[in-house]
């Protein structure tokens, strides 16, 4: 409990008590005030006597809780004289008898010997009442010998606040709202245990009510308490709070109802009614007493749930009760009853109605007026408490300084009600522990809240940068070190990298803000991912999304199972430790399944394949390895090994964070002008984007063949694969390559990697995107502008490709493609390439990164670093090209030294060029060195017709001789195609292989780009410089404090990067939740709603941007599967992990998670998930724009319904 809350009037009203540490000065000041008040009160006639009597029996301890407890300071007035026995200070009252279960509060019952005229006030304090201090510390058990030890020991731990609140004007008391705790009556229902907290009301007499927190008749989540201790009813005291005006001593206590005794106790709050009025905390001390299940806050705080600030206000009511405590000489059953009744009336929470109040001291003749504001004030009256005796001497104790106690936590996080909370429990739930804001609520409402909104949005960007630039790369290094498979890594480490903000938000919600902000954020983020992200991907993709059914089906199956568990656990609004463990085990099961994902996938598909329907599903995606057909041959398996997890989305857990395709937010903001636009490579993207094209069915490819001359060895244009794979491919493909002349039919990309680097440093360009067939994506940004359209063959090859029939090609290509047709012989020096030779072909080569494809009897000699040489029938290719593709047709001869170009030559053509693309028709000769094509581009296209000769030194070569070039080339392609294809089946297989290899190549290039370490280099353009300065406050501290493991020299510090990233994420998450809380407080919406809406969207927007970019590249299913996969981590780790930690720290106590609308929101999420999977399945695993738009709208419908549920505008039909 070591936290005190300052109850200053202003702060009380704001309902947001501030934490303060009690200081000696305040304590001394309070003591002085109490002492002076006591002196003043002792002057009246019988008080000294009464006091003397009381003190003789039980020396009064000032503030049994003693300020130390913060609970209350008891004023011990020394006047022994005041005879008024009234001073019963029986704290015990209210819950006396029935208290047993509740946390003991200190009931200090000073039983006064009844003073002279006063009927003996027998405080109902039980003799054996032994308060157990829970919250505050010292409980004074003071079992008073007083007669009628009615309160047989109160177990309550409430500290006895002996504070005698002076009953100043009863009006004041009135002002204090009794409702506070137990009653909250008025407003705050929870007043568990110690509603007396509120009872600050001055107790006219010395009554020191000891508010037992026990009875929270008010709801308060202490349901347990309530149930058990109905007796607590006596607690009413708080409620009682009546105003007992008894500032006047003697008779003034006019309204001290008999029940007053109990009231008294409940009021025990020493804080004077003033305090109450002020809404001062006073209650806090009570709180301690309340500590029993009731969270101390409760009392002091006025119920756990109730905002702490409220407590104060409510406390007032409580105090009144205590005031009433006039010592009643005896607690006759009748009186007791009356008191109790009255009390009840005031505090309607009858359930606690334990009669305990036996202290019905009729104390003052005047009934307590006790208008308890507490709700249900039903008159309860002015029960005159049969004042057996009027205690003339009301000992009015000056209100002790309010000792703030820790605010009670919101009930949501409270521990289970039936279980008595440990004495320290109240501290577990202090109300939102946020630093004090520089601006007050009024100032924020005047416009300063804009700063909080900006800060919250800025932190969203900071979280994305930390995760993408440091945390995810560090996790990647860890998975490499542990040699974890891609599937398992994607489901564990990479999922954690993407969901780290949500996890930390959940931790902050449980341990710091004590609210449901974490649950709201995770549920809101889940709906955002399922509806908004997937819907947006469908809307913005260039074509209808063809989804891979297996990963989506697998992840949604697990997700539905996990959500059903969560809904069941939410039914009782409590999460027990074993429920948290079950959710964590569900995640472990998911990871285990991912370990055997491929085997499971094959088994499921085999089972489905036995039925016609299954085939439709299985054939749903041809683009993914292993997904295209039920039977996955070795070839596919080998490819899977080659491909990185990102592109094998179908067979691995979908995690954008695990994919090199993902561009970080920092890179997007600084280096991409059009993040949502297609990467440069897809310039001509009318054709299918690289992946979609891959997805195209073999039939489509077959159709395209006839059109495009290439008998298409459709994929003969396999992009260079890593060297190790070269030989294997050679062996596999020899028969299928017969089509040497073919050049890229079907718009496949070739020349991949090789051209990409040469063509530009365009990060977006997926490596080697030059599509040989219809689409050349290989052009660099620079090149694209100076591109001269090729007019041949319908311009299937925009970017130069060299095709020569019967020609001879000599070149040294670093990054080119050499394809040789039948009769060709290939001899090359390639380090990283693939050599594919057709029938009768001879291949000898050392490829760097290129592919040599030779047709039957073809001969190719070349020294390629990264290229492909394609030669037509009888062609000989010898090239020295740096970055180009040489395609030679029959009888063609090409000699060139190209740095960044492609040479295309027709029959009998000779081409020599240094930089550019040369396309020559029959008999055409073009020689150029350092030639620039239109626009002065380094990478241009030169097209020459028959008989044309063009030579250029360093000037533009723009020669277009279009005689028969087009026809000839088409003819050549046709021949090549005829020779090349042995069968459609072989071609289809080749296409699939080549597609995969192309994807891999592109991925590698992008990976290289994305793996670039964070650079603080000053950008060139003004716009980028502005963005750079905007991000510098985030990036610079990260750069200084966290090693970038993407740098080779820093890779060994991956542990520091991992831990440092976690610290930064935790800090940014805290700022995000804090500022969101301030914004919500200003606008008037709860943290739960902020989590469902703003925080959920903010933490998921980086993934949204990445998903849309990936979807536009054709990897739509990857984006969709990733959205569902990340949600599994949130539900099975993000939620249960903080709950489990909380339970372990607090003795395996359950965590309260009740909320007006969260349960219904989870049910809505479940229904939306069923809708999404069923609608996609009905659409045959394709997502059109109409379905995407529908999901987009459903997201907003969900938000509106959730907010209305949380604000109780509508009620949840399935609430529990």
Swiss-Prot record:
Biased composition (Basic and acidic residues): 702-712
Residue numbers carrying Phosphothreonine: 717
Superkingdom classification of source: Eukaryota
Glycosylated residues in this chain: 290, 303
Free-text description of this protein's post-translational modifications in UniProt: The uncleaved signal sequence is required for efficient membrane targeting and proper membrane integration and topology. Glycosylated.
Alpha- repeat ranges, renumbered to this chain: 488-528, 1096-1127
Location within or outside the cell: Cell membrane
Expression across tissues: Retina.
GO biological process, one term: intracellular calcium ion homeostasis
Region (8 X 17 AA tandem repeats of D-E-D-E-G-E-I-Q-A-G-E-[GA]-G-E-V-[EK]-G): 796-928
Phosphoserine PTM sites in chain numbering: 652
Keyword Transmembrane helix among UniProt keywords: yes
Main location (coarse class): membrane
GO cellular component: plasma membrane
Sequence repeats: 796-811, 812-828, 829-845, 846-862, 863-879, 880-896, 897-913, 914-928
Extent of Acidic residues compositional bias: 824-834, 841-851, 858-868, 875-885, 892-902, 924-941, 981-1011
Cytoplasmic domain ranges by topology: 468-491, 540-557, 601-1024, 1074-1088, 1149-1157, 1207-1216
Extracellular face of the membrane: 1-446, 513-518, 579, 1046-1052, 1110-1127, 1179-1185
Function: Calcium, potassium:sodium antiporter that transports 1 Ca(2+) and 1 K(+) in exchange for 4 Na(+). Critical component of the visual transduction cascade, controlling the calcium concentration of outer segments during light and darkness. Light causes a rapid lowering of cytosolic free calcium in the outer segment of both retinal rod and cone photoreceptors and the light-induced lowering of calcium is caused by extrusion via this protein which plays a key role in the process of light adaptation.
Protein's name in the database: Sodium/potassium/calcium exchanger 1
Record lineage: Eukaryota, Metazoa, Chordata, Craniata, Vertebrata
Record gene name: SLC24A1
């Amino acid at each position: 409990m070591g936290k005190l809350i300052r109850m200053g009037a202003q702060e009380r009203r704001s309902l947001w008590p501030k934490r303060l540490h009690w200081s000696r000065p305040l304590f001394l000041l309070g003591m002085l005030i109490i002492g002076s008040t006591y002196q003043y009160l002792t002057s009246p006639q019988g008080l000294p006597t009464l006091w003397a009597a009381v003190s003789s029996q039980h020396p009064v301890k000032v503030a049994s809780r003693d300020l130390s407890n913060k609970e209350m300071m008891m004023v011990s007035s020394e006047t022994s004289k005041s005879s008024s026995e009234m001073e019963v200070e029986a704290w015990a009252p209210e819950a006396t008898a029935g208290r047993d279960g509740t946390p003991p509060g200190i009931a200090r019952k000073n039983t006064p010997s009844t003073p002279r005229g006063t009927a003996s006030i027998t405080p109902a304090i039980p003799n054996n009442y032994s308060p157990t201090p829970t919250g505050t510390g010292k409980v004074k058990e003071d079992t008073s010998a007083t007669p009628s030890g009615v309160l047989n020991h109160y177990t309550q731990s409430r500290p006895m606040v002996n504070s005698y609140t002076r009953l100043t004007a009863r009006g004041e008391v009135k002002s204090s709202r009794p409702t506070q705790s137990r009653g909250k009556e008025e407003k705050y229902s929870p007043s568990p245990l110690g509603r007396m907290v509120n009872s600050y009301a001055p107790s006219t007499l010395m009554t020191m009510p000891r508010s037992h927190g026990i009875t929270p008749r008010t709801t308060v989540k202490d349901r347990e308490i309530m149930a058990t201790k109905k007796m607590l009813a006596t607690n009413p005291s708080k409620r009682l709070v009546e105003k007992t005006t008894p500032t006047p001593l003697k008779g003034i206590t006019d309204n001290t109802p008999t029940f007053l005794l109990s009231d008294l106790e409940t009021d025990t709050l020493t804080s004077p009614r003033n305090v109450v009025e002020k809404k001062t905390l006073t209650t806090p001390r009570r709180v301690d007493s309340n500590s029993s299940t009731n969270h101390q806050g409760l009392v002091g705080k006025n119920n756990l749930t109730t905002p702490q600030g409220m407590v104060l206000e409510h406390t007032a009511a409580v105090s009144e009760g205590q005031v009433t405590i006039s010592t009643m000489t005896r607690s006759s059953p009748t009186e007791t009853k009356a008191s109790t009744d009255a009390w009840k009336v005031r505090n309607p929470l009858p359930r606690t109605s334990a009669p305990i109040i036996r202290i019905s001291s009729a104390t003052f003749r005047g009934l307590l007026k006790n208008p308890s504001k507490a709700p249900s004030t039903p008159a309860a009256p002015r029960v005159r408490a049969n004042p057996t005796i009027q205690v003339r001497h009301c000992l009015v104790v000056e209100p002790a300084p309010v000792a703030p106690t820790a605010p009670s936590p919101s009930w949501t996080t409270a521990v289970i009600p039936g279980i008595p909370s440990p004495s320290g429990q109240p501290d577990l739930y202090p109300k939102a522990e946020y630093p004090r804001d520089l601006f007050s609520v009024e100032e924020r409402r005047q416009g300063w809240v804009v700063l909080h909104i900006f800060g919250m949005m800025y932190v969203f960007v900071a979280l994305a940068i930390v995760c993408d630039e440091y945390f995810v790369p560090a996790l990647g290094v860890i998975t490499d070190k542990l040699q974890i498979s891609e599937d398992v890594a994607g489901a564990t480490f990479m999922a954690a990298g993407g969901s780290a903000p949500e996890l930390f938000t959940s931790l902050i919600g449980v341990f710091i803000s004590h609210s449901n902000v974490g649950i709201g954020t995770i549920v809101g983020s889940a709906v955002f991912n399922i509806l908004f992200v997937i819907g947006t991907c469908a809307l913005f993709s260039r074509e209808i999304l063809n989804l891979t059914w297996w990963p989506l089906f697998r992840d949604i199956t697990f997700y539905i199972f996990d959500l059903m568990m969560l809904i069941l656990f939410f039914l009782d609004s409590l999460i027990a430790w074993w429920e948290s463990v079950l959710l964590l085990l569900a995640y472990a099961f998911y990871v285990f399944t991912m370990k055997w994902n491929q085997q499971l996938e094959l088994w499921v598909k085999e089972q489905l394949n036995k039925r016609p329907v299954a085939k439709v599903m299985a054939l749903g995606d041809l683009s993914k390895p292993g997904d295209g057909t039920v039977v996955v041959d070795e070839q596919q398996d080998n490819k899977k090994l080659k491909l990185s997890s990102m592109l094998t989305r179908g067979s691995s857990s979908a995690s954008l964070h695990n994919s090199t395709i993902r561009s970080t937010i920092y890179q997007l903001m600084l280096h991409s002008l059009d993040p949502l636009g297609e990467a440069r490579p897809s310039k001509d993207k009318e054709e299918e984007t690289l992946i979609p094209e891959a997805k195209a069915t073999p039939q489509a490819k077959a159709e395209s063949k006839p059109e495009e001359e290439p008998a298409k060895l459709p994929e003969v244009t396999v992009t260079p694969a890593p060297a190790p794979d070269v030989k294997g491919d050679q062996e596999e493909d020899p028969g299928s390559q017969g089509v040497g002349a073919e050049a890229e039919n079907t718009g496949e990309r070739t020349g991949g990697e090789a051209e990409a680097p040469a063509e530009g440093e365009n990060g977006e360009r997926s490596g080697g995107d030059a599509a040989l067939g219809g689409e050349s994506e290989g052009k660099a940004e620079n090149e694209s502008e100076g591109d001269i359209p090729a007019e041949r063959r319908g311009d299937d090859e925009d970017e130069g490709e060299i095709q020569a029939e019967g020609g001879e090609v000599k070149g040294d290509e670093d990054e080119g493609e050499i394809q040789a047709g039948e009769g060709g012989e290939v001899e090359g020096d390639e380090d990283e390439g693939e050599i594919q030779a057709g029938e009768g072909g001879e291949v000898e080569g050392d490829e760097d990164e290129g592919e040599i494809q030779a047709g039957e009897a073809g001969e190719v000699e070349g020294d390629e670093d990264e290229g492909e040489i394609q030669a037509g029938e009888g062609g000989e290719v010898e090239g020295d090209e740096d970055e180009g593709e040489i395609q030679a047709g029959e009888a063609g001869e090409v000699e060139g030294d190209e740095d960044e170009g492609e040479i295309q030559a027709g029959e009998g053509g000779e081409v020599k060029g240094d930089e550019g693309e040369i396309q020559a028709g029959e008999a055409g000769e073009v020689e150029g060195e350092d030639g620039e094509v239109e626009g002065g581009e380094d990478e241009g296209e030169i097209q020459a017709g028959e008989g044309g000769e063009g030579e250029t030194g360093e000037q533009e070569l723009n020669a277009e001789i279009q005689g028969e070039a087009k026809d000839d080339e088409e003819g050549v392609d046709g021949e090549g195609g005829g020779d090349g294809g042995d069968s459609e089946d072989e071609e289809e297989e080749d296409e699939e292989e080549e597609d995969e290899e192309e994807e891999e190549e592109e991925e590698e290039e992008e990976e290289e780009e994305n793996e670039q370490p964070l650079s603080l280099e000053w950008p060139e353009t003004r716009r980028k410089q502005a963005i750079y300065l905007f991000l510098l406050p985030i990036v610079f501290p990260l750069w200084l404090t966290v090693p970038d493991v993407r740098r080779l020299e820093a890779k060994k510090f991956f542990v520091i990067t991992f831990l440092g990233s976690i610290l930064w994420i935790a800090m940014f998450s805290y700022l995000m939740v804090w500022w969101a809380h301030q914004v919500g407080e200003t606008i008037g919406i709860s943290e739960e709603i902020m989590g469902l809406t703003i925080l959920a969207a903010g933490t998921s927007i980086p993934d949204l941007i990445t998903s849309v970019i990936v979807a536009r590249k054709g990897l739509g299913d990857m984006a969709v599967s990733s959205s569902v996969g990340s949600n599994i981590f949130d539900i099975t780790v993000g939620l249960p992990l903080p709950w489990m930690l909380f339970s372990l720290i607090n003795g395996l106590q359950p965590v309260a998670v009740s909320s007006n609308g969260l349960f219904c929101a989870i049910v809505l999420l479940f229904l939306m998930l069923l809708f999404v999977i069923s609608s996609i399945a009905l659409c045959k695993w394709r997502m059109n724009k109409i379905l995407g738009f529908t999901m987009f709208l459903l997201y907003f419908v969900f938000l509106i319904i959730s907010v209305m549920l949380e604000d109780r505008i509508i009620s949840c039909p399935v609430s529990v």
